[in-house]
Amino acid sequence: MKKHIRTFLAVMLAMTMFNACSSNENFDENGKIANAFEQRRNLVGGNYFDIFGELDGLRLQAMQFMYAYMPLPDIADYPAEYHLQNVDYALKARAEMPWGKTVPVREFLHFVVPVRVNNENMDTSRAVFYNELKERVRNLSMHDAVLEINHWCHEKVTYTPSDIRTSSPLATVRTAYGRCGEESTFTVAALRAMGIPARQVYTPRWAHTDNNHAWVEAWVDGEWHFLGACEPEPVLDLAWFNAPASRGMLMHTNVFGGYDGPEEVLSVTPCYTEINVTANYAPVVTTNVKIVDKDGNPVKATVEFKIYNYAEFYSAATKESNENGETSITCGHGDMIVWASKDGKFGFTKFTAGKDCDVTVVLDKEPGYTATLEMNITPPKERNTIPAVTAEQAGENARRYACEDSIRNAYVATFPTDAYATELAAELGLDNATVATLFKQSRGNYATMVDFLRACPADAKEKAMRLLFCISEKDRRDVSLDVLNDHIVAALESDNNTDWFYNFVVNPRVSNEMITPYRSFFKSVILADDVMKYKANPELWVEWCRNNIKVADTWNPLSLCMSPKGVWEMRVADTHSRDIFFVSAARAMGIPARVDEVTNKTQYLCDGMWVDVNFEALESNNAPQGKVKASFVPSAFIDNPKYYSHFSISKIVDGRLQLLNYPEDATWESLLKDGSALDTGDYFMMTGTRMADGGVLAHLTFFTVEEGKENRLQYVLRESNERLQVIGDFNSENLFYDTTEQRERSLLSATGRGYYIIALVAPGSEPTNHFLRDVMPYKDEFEKWEQKMVLLFRDTNEAERFVNDFPELPSTVVWGTDINDNIYNEIVANMKLKNPNRPIILVADTFNRVVFMSQGYSIGLGEQLVKVIKQLSE
C-alpha cells in the first residue's frame, strides 16, 4: 500500500481542479447513501472511518457509497487512503474523459467507482491503467474507446486455465495470461479506470457442456454491450461465445451496492445486488415455483435453481420463497432442477422452462431418504445471432491481433531462459530442472524468486525451494518477497524435514486466500506462554477463536478472504475467513492445521490424527464414519469413470447438497472400487452421460452412511444407442506444427470454436489411403459444414514422404505434424487404445469433448463422419 499512499497528496492537488467542475453534481440527492453509510459505521466501529472527517462534496459521497456497501475484508485489509485514491481516479476520469459526464450517476456509482470486480486481490491498477490509457483513448468515441481498450488488454494478456483464486489485474498483466475470470476482471478494471461503466458477466455453469465462462459488458451511450475479455473483435456484441451463450440457462452479475436498474433482481445482500442478464444473450421465459409441505401448505423455504454440470446439480441461483411459498426464475428455454429445503426436509423436481409455466415442489424428503432415479436433461437449443462484420474490418482486426500477440510475446521473451536457469542453479547449488520449472511457473514474478533464493543462507536454499513448491503455481506468479521472507523462518528454525511439517506448518497457503506475511505478526501479538499452552492443547486455541472472533457472514456474501491479520484486528469475520485465520495462526505457532480440501472441515493434527474443529461445541470431536463402495461394469470407452466428468458425491446437510471436493484426478477406481470412508449422514451420488447435443442421461442415487458399516452401491452409467454421446476428452489447446503456415499453433486456433475432425495419419499406408479416399466423395458436405479437418503426420519426415494423390479432399483440411507425439499419446491414454495403428480419427469440440472415434482399417469412414456431423448440426 506504500505506493498509493505516496501518490495520495499529488492526487489531492489534482482533485482541486476537477471537483470545481463537478460542483453542480450530487450523488446522494435523497440522502440514501448517507443513511446507509451511518448505519454501516455504527455497525463496524473502530478507526476505519477516521478519514471521513477530512472529506466533502463528491469525494465524501463516493466514499460513503463505497463504505456503506463494502464487504468486511475490504475495510479490514485496505486502508481508507487506498479506497480514496481509487475514488479520486474515478472522479478524475469523469472530469477528463469526453464521455465522463454522459454517464448517469447510477451507472457511475455502481459500475465505475468500485475497484473490486469479483473476488480478486485488489491493487493499484486503476491509477496505473488510467495513466497508460488516457492519451490512447482521449480522442475516441465511447464506443471506439471500449474496442481500443480491449485491444490494449490483448497486448497484455491471453488465456490460459488456472486455479480458482483470482489474480489481481496487475498480477495478471505481469504474468501475461489468465483464465477467463482473470481476463474479464482485468478488462473491467481497465474500462472502469477510464470512466466507462463495466461489469463482469458470467454463466456459473453452461447447460450444454461441462464448463463455465466469464466475460465483460460495457455501458456505451445508454446501452450495455458485451465483449470477450482480451479477445478484441471489430465490433461489440461479437465473441466466440455468441453461440454457446444463446444456449445458456442463466447469466448474471453482482452489482456493488443497492442497485435499482431495469434488470431482474435475483438476490439482494448488504453488499451487492445480483441481477439476471440472460435476456441479453438468449430467449428467456419466466417459470413460477411454489413450495409446499406434504399436506399442500405453502412453505417459506430456500429455493435453489440447479444446472447439471461437472456431474453435479450446481446451484446457479438461490432464492427464498415468500409466505405463500412462491418464487420464480427467468431463464433460457431448457431443463433446470429446482431444489427446495427447510429445516432438514427437502424436495426437488426437473422442469422445462418454456414448457412448464408453473411448478410445485413438495418438501417430502426427510433425513434417511434413499432412492435411485433416472433423469434426462435437455439444454436450450442454439439460436445464434452474429453482428455484421465487413471483410475490411475482419482483416484489420486480424492484423492488429497479430501485432498485439507480438507485443505480448516480446514481453514474455524477457522471462528467464533455460540457459539462465542452468546458470542460476549452478550459482545456488540447486537442481537445474527444478529451477527451470520454477522460472517457467513464476513467469513475470521470476525476479522475486531470484531475490529470495539468493538471500537465503547457503545451507537453507533447499528449504527455500521446498517452501516455493508448497505454495500453488499461481502463488509463484504473484507472491511477494516479504511473504516468502516471513514464512521461511518456520523452516529455518526447525530441523523437521517431513512433508507434513512443510505442508501444514511452513506452508502459508490454507485455502483460496491471497497469502500474506502473517507469521511474524502472530509471533508479535500472541504471548509466548500462550503459544506453549496452545501447542500443548490445541483445543484451547479453538476455544480462544470461539470466544473472540465474531462470525458475520452477512457482510461478506461473496466469501472474500479476509487476511489473518485483518481478522485478528477486527475480531469479526465470515466463517471461511475465520477458518483460514484459525489455521494460519495455528501454523504460526507450530501447530499443524488445515482446511480439508474434500470436506472443507477445519482440522488440527494431534498424535498423528486429524481432529475436526467444532467452533460451536465446547470440545472438538471427529465425526463417526462408515464406508461406501460401488461396483461398476466397464463400457466400451469408459473403464474408470472420472469424478466431475462422470460422477460426483454430495453430502446432504440440512436438506441442501454439499459437494465433496475430491482432487481433479479422482476416479471410480480411486474412490469407490475399494471404498472410501465418509462421515455418517445422508448422501447423493450423481452419474451422468453427456450426449453430443449437450443433453444428459443422469442416474441419481440417494444413500446413507452409518457408523462402522459399509454401504455397497451400484454405479450406473447410462448409455444411448440412438444418440451421439461424449465418449472421452481431448485437449483442444494441444499444439501441432502447421505445415502450411510453418509454425506451431494450437488446434483451437486452427479450427475455431465448435466441433472439428482430427486424424492421425500415416503416409502410404493402406488404411490411411482408404480413409482419405472415403472422405473425398463427401467433399461438399464437409465444406458446407465449414468446420476444420486437421490431418497430422507423426513428424516432418512423414509429412515430406506423403504423396498427395487425393485432389478432392475438402478445402477445410489443415495439414500438420504432431509434436513429440504429444497428441498421439494423449489420444491413446484418454481413449484407452490398445495398439498404435493409424489412422486414428476423432470428432471432438473445443470444450474438449470427444463424440466419435475410429482407429485403423475401416471402410465407409467418410459416410460415417457425415452422419456424425449431421447429427451434430441438428
How should these model regions be labeled?
Residues S267-N280, T352-V389, N621, A698-N731:
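Extracellular beta-sheet/turn segments enriched in Thr/Pro/Gly and aliphatic residues
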Residues N24-F27, E135-R136, L140, A145-H151, ...:
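Hydrophobic/aromatic-rich core segments of domains that either
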Residues S746-V775, K788-L792:
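Short active-site neighborhood of thiol/selenol oxidoreductases, capturing the structured segment around
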Residues E25, G31-T175, N211, G395, ...:
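Secondary-structure boundary elements
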Residues L713-S749, H770, T817-D818, K867:
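N-terminal "domain-start" segment that seeds a small globular fold
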Residues D221, N322-V338, K342-K345, F351-C357, ...:
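Short Pro-Gly-centered beta-turn/loop motif in secreted/extracellular proteins
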Residues N837-G856:
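A short, hydrophobic beta-strand/beta-hairpin element that forms part of a small beta-sheet core
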Residues N804-R838:
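Short, internal strand/loop/helix patches
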